[in-house]
UniProtKB/Swiss-Prot annotation:
HAMAP family xrefs: BioB (MF_01694)
Reactions it catalyzes: (4R,5S)-dethiobiotin + (sulfur carrier)-SH + 2 reduced [2Fe-2S]-[ferredoxin] + 2 S-adenosyl-L-methionine = (sulfur carrier)-H + biotin + 2 5'-deoxyadenosine + 2 L-methionine + 2 oxidized [2Fe-2S]-[ferredoxin]
Source organism (scientific name): Methylorubrum extorquens (strain PA1)
Biological process according to GO: biotin biosynthetic process
EC number(s) per entry: 2.8.1.6
Keyword Iron-sulfur annotated: yes
Class of the enzyme per the UniProt entry, highest EC level: transferase
Keyword check for Lyase: no
Protein purpose: Catalyzes the conversion of dethiobiotin (DTB) to biotin by the insertion of a sulfur atom into dethiobiotin via a radical-based mechanism.
Gene name of the encoded protein: bioB
NCBIfam families hit by this protein: bioB
Name of the protein: Biotin synthase
Stored InterPro entries: Aldolase_TIM (IPR013785), BATS_dom (IPR010722), Biotin_synth/BioAB (IPR002684), Biotin_synthase (IPR024177), Elp3/MiaA/NifB-like_rSAM (IPR006638), rSAM (IPR007197)
């Protein structure tokens, strides 16, 4: 084992914002059992291991996005994905879904709109009303709307938004292979607007798009050296959708997700590490290994924007089996 890793495993990780790429790669590449143990030690030093957040995710405006993200069926550039373009959902319909999610045990309600950036006007005003409504239900509220101005971020903060999702997707070197219509700096600027408004940052990425391990480490480096760390870090496995440029990418090894969850936990000890898209392909045992490695949030519900997710009953059973208290489901879906 390298001296770098030995020094990192001597005691639970402190909160740092000065990580190097070499350190993060060394952590990621540790023998798996050592890595999971190390991440578990850090996780238990900073978090309650029985506290696994359940977040629900709803697409409030689907399809027709002008961005060309290679993984996304919502892009207007990927005609073969055959995803219809829809208008923004009515506020009352969204809040009905939020109430159902809460009854199913969700703590947070996340809303995603397929926009490059929201325009000020009726649609943005409606999103603000959705945020206020979700907060009124006693839930955390998160939205992902694309790039934001500082003024828009401030208005979302005033509406009570808990967190804003704006993923980096991958490391800066590989980024240009995945998207050309928005720069890495564009993404970082939106994250800065969100921070300046006092909103929690939800930011992570996707593995399995053809990137190198170095690219994954570079993404974590960017996130871990932001101060403060993101409030939550979604770790997604690519869901290869027919009609997108990445439709033929093979599934990743589940242990790659375990390594990403563990590394994210070690370098960002207090962040919510969210096991996100692609979880449906994991066995119960692989998911439990991710929890041991420090994942402490999941998307709860049978769809994630446009892709399938685990059934709520199966998730509830899994969480109960590992000792996480989950209320009995009282409402399976919005009527």
């Amino acid at each position: 084992m390298s001296d770098t890793v030995v020094s990192l495993t001597a005691s639970p990780a402190a909160i740092r914002h000065d990580w190097t790429l070499a350190e993060i790669q060394a952590i990621h590449d540790m023998p798996l059992l050592d890595l999971v143990h190390r991440a578990g030690v850090v996780h238990r030093a900073h978090n309650d291991p029985a506290d696994i957040q359940r977040a629900a995710l709803l697409s409030i405006k689907t399809g027709g996005c002008p961005e060309d993200c290679a993984y996304c069926p919502q892009s207007a550039h990927h005609k073969g994905a055959n995803l219809p373009r829809e208008r923004l959902m009515p506020v009352d319909a969204v809040l009905k879904e939020a109430a159902a999610a809460k009854a199913n045990g969700a703590h947070r309600f996340c809303m995603g709109a397929a926009w490059r950036k929201p325009k000020d006007g009726p649609d943005f005003d409606a999103v603000l009303e959705m945020v206020r409504g979700v907060r009124g239900l006693g839930m955390e509220a998160c939205v992902t709307l694309g790039m934001l101005t500082q003024s828009q971020a401030q208005r979302l903060a005033e509406a009570g938004l808990t967190s804003y999702n704006h993923n980096l997707d991958t490391g800066p070197e590989f980024y240009g292979d995945i998207i050309s219509t928005r720069t890495y700096d564009d993404r970082l600027q939106t994250l800065e607007h969100v921070r300046q408004a006092g909103i929690g940052v939800c930011c992570g990425g996707i593995v399995g798009m053809g990137e190198r391990v170095r690219d994954r480490a570079e993404m974590l480096l960017v996130l871990a050296n932001h101060a403060p760390h993101p409030e939550s870090v979604p770790i997604n496995a690519l869901v290869a959708v027919e009609g997108t440029p990445l439709e033929d990418r093979p599934p990743i090894d589940p242990l790659d997700l375990v390594r990403m969850c563990a590394t994210a936990r070690i370098v960002m000890p207090k962040a919510r590490v969210r096991l996100s898209a692609g979880r449906k392909s994991l066995t119960r045992e692989a998911q439990i290994l991710c929890f041991l490695a420090g994942a402490n949030s999941i998307f709860y519900g049978e769809r994630l924007l446009t892709t399938a997710n685990n059934e709520a009953d199966a998730d509830a059973e899994l969480l109960r089996d590992i000792g996480v208290p989950v209320p009995e489901v009282t409402l399976a879906a919005a009527e």
